A protein has these predicted regions:
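N-terminal lobe/hinge region of extracytoplasmic solute-binding protein
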Residues: 35-89, 203-204
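Gly/Pro-rich hinge or "lid" segments in bacterial periplasmic/extracellular proteins
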Residues: 67-72, 174-233, 237, 355, ...
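Surface-exposed binding/hinge segments that line
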Residues: 86, 97, 133-187
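Extracytoplasmic/peripheral linker and loop segments enriched in polar/acidic and small residues
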Residues: 92, 153, 311, 316-320, ...
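Ligand-site clamp/hinge motif
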Residues: 193-199, 226-271, 415, 424-426, ...
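Append "and occasionally in soluble cytosolic enzymes with long acidic Gly/Pro-rich linkers
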Residues: 220-222, 229, 310-416, 504
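Acidic-aromatic pocket-rim loops
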Residues: 284-304, 408, 434-491, 544-547
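Long beta-strand-rich cores associated with HINT superfamily self-processing modules
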Residues: 527-551
Length: 551
């Protein structure tokens, strides 16, 4: 599977993943976070999972950091390694002024040369980092490797100018990433960086340092008292405890053996609400569930590598009928206990300036679904209970991944809903990796999955018509008008102009219905009430931990 695709898939789906109990955390100044799996690295170059990303960003700082402005529904940048920055009037460059008091944990000063080295390595195809291919606004070669001479001007140890290509649309979020120490990693050949021993005994710049790692047990981060972020009244230790079994994590949460866990199941909410030591928060608007309809014919693609309309899902009216026929609200209420909301497009309600709240949902209406299908020429010509058209019966396989109890629940309701309008659905369960391989190869008819969306909004990777170069467009959606809108949205525009383009895109994708957008699912987070100053936002739960304190 393509490495870049794997990086995106690492945040694709909620999969509910045992460990014995330990001492209670309530009498210490440390915080214990329960996680379902161990990490594979402490190097941000290769932090492909959500937990790896969260931990490495505590160890390695970036030029700037971001916080979520809930009122505006957008990111706000604030200084971190850089104390300030300014853009050229034409956005052709940005100049960063770095702090001069930051040292790596081995005592070596952090300078602009570390920043240049980091971006160079991130973009190196030999390294194949999690960020490879995203630096299109900088000067790069044919392999997307940054041209260091053209892109960077190191004016001093603490002043760096970054230059951008003409007609590009640079954004701060595209160039601000965890900085790694040049003096440590320049000793390795680039091809050997992923297995470098210093990935596991890291020299870091953040408020935290790796204190101890017991593989598949615990990751212990201690505070870096030399960090400019250090405050003596905040937490002294942050422990990530590996507990693969969900029930065991939940039990330890209730007993106070861990202080925080994410992905709490809705059926456990009432029990936790009755626990005097636990408070519940939600991360909203980052993940939507969807039913993928393969818009292209899998047989034609497999045999000829050509894109022909799918015989069942190739026209938008049929896809709209399918959405009308599925009772999404029932699943949202009965399984998710309304911890979420119905989805209409891939743009989340958290993006207040971009989200079009006037888009009308395709609410459950099987009669309307039947009428649309009849108008499209579908009928039960042989009275066998399955509608057909031109000799093709409307029967398909709906594939779901193993390991998440929500998926078979959804699939059963979908099967029954579609049966009621004359469509036969066969449910197949596959291991996640196998299912994704088939989807990427465009072999599946239909599937249930979820996207964990990036911030800021990214549409082109998922919906652009160039299917050869857009591997995350799993359903094979193609619309040239939508393409033009996505191209324009890559350019810096006034907010009102940008808002108009987002609205137009939502109208198009809602009318085309390339997938059935099911609902936005809230990630329910359990937190021990002894933790103070913790701020749960769409950016996640494990952020800005240097601000946490313990009562």
């Amino acid at each position: 599977m393509n490495r870049k695709v794997v990086a995106c898939l690492s945040v694709l789906l909620i999969v509910v993943l045992t460990s014995c109990g330990g001492e209670k955390t309530s009498e210490s100044n440390r915080v214990v976070v329960g996680i379902p799996a161990d990490v594979n690295t402490f190097n941000p170059l290769f932090a492909f999972t959500v937990d790896e990303g969260a931990i490495t960003e505590l160890l390695y700082l970036s030029l700037a950091d971001f916080q979520w402005n809930a009122e505006q529904g957008e990111l706000e940048a604030y200084p971190m390694l850089a104390k300030s920055w300014e853009w050229a009037k034409d956005s052709s460059s940005i100049t960063f002024h770095l702090r001069d008091d930051v040292k790596w944990s081995d005592g070596v000063p952090l300078t602009a040369n570390d920043v240049v080295f980091s971006l160079d390595v991130y973009s190196d195809p030999v390294v194949d980092s999690r960020l490879f291919g995203i630096f299109e606004d900088l000067y790069t070669d044919k392999e997307n490797h940054i041209d260091v001479a053209k892109s960077f001007v190191v004016k001093s140890d603490y002043e760096l100018q970054i230059n951008f290509k003409p007609h590009s649309s640079p954004d701060l979020v595209d160039i601000v990433h965890p900085v790694i120490p040049k003096h440590i990693f320049e000793r390795y050949k680039r091809k050997d960086l992923e297995t470098a021993k210093d990935n596991f005994n890291p020299v870091t710049s953040g408020m935290f340092v790796l204190k101890k790692w017991d593989r598949n047990q615990t990751i212990t981060l201690g505070v870096n008292k030399n960090s400019f972020l250090y405050k003596p009244d905040k937490i002294s230790e942050l422990v990530f405890k590996v507990i693969p079994d969900y029930t065991s994590r939940l039990t330890q949460m209730k007993k106070g053996e861990i202080d925080l866990m994410e992905l709490i199941k809705t059926e456990d909410i009432n029990d936790l609400k009755n626990n005097v030591n636990v408070m519940l928060k939600t991360i909203e608007g980052r993940e939507y569930e969807y039913i993928g309809w393969n818009n292209i014919d899998p047989k034609t693609y497999e045999e000829k590598k050509e894109f022909a309309p799918n015989k069942l899902f190739g026209d938008k009216e049929t896809r709209i009928a399918l959405t009308y026929a599925i009772n999404r609200q029932e699943i949202l209420e009965d399984y998710l206990y309304n911890y979420g909301e119905l989805a209409a497009t891939p743009i989340s309600p958290i993006f207040k300036s971009a989200y079009d709240q006037n888009i009308k949902q395709y609410e459950y209406n099987p009669d309307k679904a039947k009428k649309i299908l009849t108008d499209e020429g579908w009928s039960d010509s042989n009275n066998n209970g399955i509608i057909d058209k031109n000799g093709v019966e409307f029967e398909f396989t709906l594939t779901i991944p193993s390991g998440n109890p929500l998926r078979p629940y959804e699939a059963t309701i979908i099967k029954n809903n579609l049966k009621a309008i004359g469509i036969e659905v066969n449910i197949a369960t596959l291991e996640m990796g196998t299912m994704m391989d088939d989807i990427i190869a465009r072999k599946q008819d239909s599937w249930i999955a979820a996207w964990y969306i990036p911030i800021p909004i990214e549409l082109k990777s998922y919906w652009y018509s160039d299917l050869q170069n857009t591997p995350l467009n799993f359903v094979g959606y193609q619309n040239k008008t939508a393409d033009k809108l996505m191209d324009k949205l890559k350019i810096h525009l006034p907010k009102e102009r940008q808002k108009k383009l987002y609205y137009q895109f939502q109208e198009i994708i809602h009318e085309d219905q390339p997938v059935t957008f099911m609902y936005w699912i809230s990630d329910i987070v359990g937190i021990n009430k002894r933790i103070k100053n913790i701020n749960i936002t769409p950016l996640g739960a494990i952020t800005h931990c240097w601000e946490w304190s313990v009562k």
